[in-house]
Amino acid sequence: MTKRTSAKYKIDRRMGENIWGRPKSPVNKREYGPGQHGQRRKNKLSDFGTQLRAKQKLKGYYGDLTEKQFRKIFAEAERVKGDTGEMLVGLLERRLDAIVYRAKFVPTIFAARQFVNHGHVTVNGQRVNIGSYRCKEGDVIQVREKSRQLALVLEATQLAERDVPDYIEVDYSKMTATFVRTPGLGDVPYPVQMEPNLVVEFYAKN
């Protein structure tokens, strides 16, 4: 288990929110940050603090992306004509690990990245082992046949805690997921409020 995987719930505690909607999240029992002083009353955040928190929450949701990774995606979103916040969400949702997670082939975004990295997935019939691989509309993602009986796959497909969004079409008989279209913010089933507009404001000032 990687350090990032074992630390996944630290993100929930740091944010004080159950950002993936998981039943086992520690914030279901308490709503304060990690550490023995977590129960102290929170001070009101400044504009900078609010923007920073929005950025940390969004990049944390996609598997605690590094600042370098997230900043690169944001820079790409800025170059595309349209609302930068919407473009940012669309680019994040086009990541292969995000689609594997959305399709419920694995239970967590962290498991999705590891699953892809270990070569369990193909895109249009070709094995791809890069979680950040960017899928296009119409791409067909499939779990390789020898990987379909893995315990985490069998567990994930039975999860009732989240639904597959309508921009992904899943056929569990073939273990395929077709990326139908690039979603906007309103299409993505985030369990908590995400504010990419605040991320845009953060990078505009920093």
UniProtKB/Swiss-Prot annotation:
Function field: One of the primary rRNA binding proteins, it binds directly to 16S rRNA where it nucleates assembly of the body of the 30S subunit.
Family matches, as PROSITE patterns: RIBOSOMAL_S4, S4
Lineage of the organism: Bacteria, Pseudomonadati, Pseudomonadota, Alphaproteobacteria, Rhodobacterales
Name used for this protein in its record: Small ribosomal subunit protein uS4
GO molecular function, one term: rRNA binding
Complexes and interactors: Part of the 30S ribosomal subunit. Contacts protein S5. The interaction surface between S4 and S5 is involved in control of translational fidelity.
Species assigned in the record: Cereibacter sphaeroides (strain ATCC 17023 / DSM 158 / JCM 6121 / CCUG 31486 / LMG 2827 / NBRC 12203 / NCIMB 8253 / ATH 2.4.1.) (Rhodobacter sphaeroides)
Keywords from the named record: Ribonucleoprotein, Ribosomal protein, RNA-binding, rRNA-binding
Keyword Methyltransferase assigned: no
Region (Disordered): 15-46
Residues annotated as domain S4 RNA-binding: 94-154
CDD domains xrefs: S4 (cd00165)
Superkingdom classification of source: Bacteria
